[in-house]
Amino acid sequence: MSLVIVGSLAFDTIQTPWGRRDRIVGGSGTYCSLAASFFTNPKIVGVVGKDFPAAVLRLFKARGVDTEGLEVRPGKSFHWEGHYGYDPNLRETIRTEINVYEGYRPQLPASYRKADIVLLANIDPDLQDDILIQVRKPKLVAMDTMNLWIGSKPKAIRRVLKKVDILFANDEEIRMLTKEANLIKAGKKILAAGPRLVVTKKGEHGALVFGRKFIFGVLAHPCEDVVDPTGAGDSFAGGFLGYLDKIQRFSHPDIRRAAVYGSVLASFAIEDFGIDRLKTLTQREIGARFRRFKKLVSF
């Protein structure tokens, strides 16, 4: 039972119709790790500056997140600023400051190299490729990406795609990557490139999971109060892989159940700004919402 998550730890400045928050803790690695920690003890890999809150590092420890792979450097942590309108699926990037990520090359501690599952969260595809050289025969490798990397490093994306089992990306990114408007055709194109699964995140409409012999759709939990959608996709990936790491099985029913747990974690993450909701979330709440999902799709 071993899940390694390689991703960003950052400060986010977020403006939504429901409010504004300046320099709150976020980042793909942060959301993925906290979501996964409800099922397993993930190991995180990333870099932060001296300004990163010690309280969050204590939170990781309390949740069983292994931080041996977390590097603290002199300087400022990664900072992203973005704006959301009333459509939570659309966001505008105002500013990105990479700070301590300048020149960063992740190095896995020896204890991380035998991981069963590796998640290459939303980082530079060249860094994702570096990680794959360092791991030894994982059972499952997943990657996430974004339109920035698809547009600027398409060859690197395709190179990494050939080496992974799962791609997580939203519908816009899937279409951009394949130049296909139809998501089913797009999913088949990506499967032909190497991965065994394509998980297409569709925001408030849930997600589609494409396998070579099946397609599975999962709802997004109906939510009246969408406060901050920033960490939804990363929380989905963390919940999905955290559950698979817990059970150590990868059958079609297991994949379907993992997708529902991913959607459950995402539905909680959006209820407050940043990681605040994940900090107060309980196993009891997760179980109750999972059962509610079953009722939503039963007929």
Show where each model-derived region lies:
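Short, conserved phosphate/pyrophosphate- and ester-handling motifs at nucleotide-, phospho-/glycolipid
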Residues: A36, N170, G233
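A short acidic, amphipathic alpha-helical/loop segment
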Residues: V56, L127-Q134, K155-R159
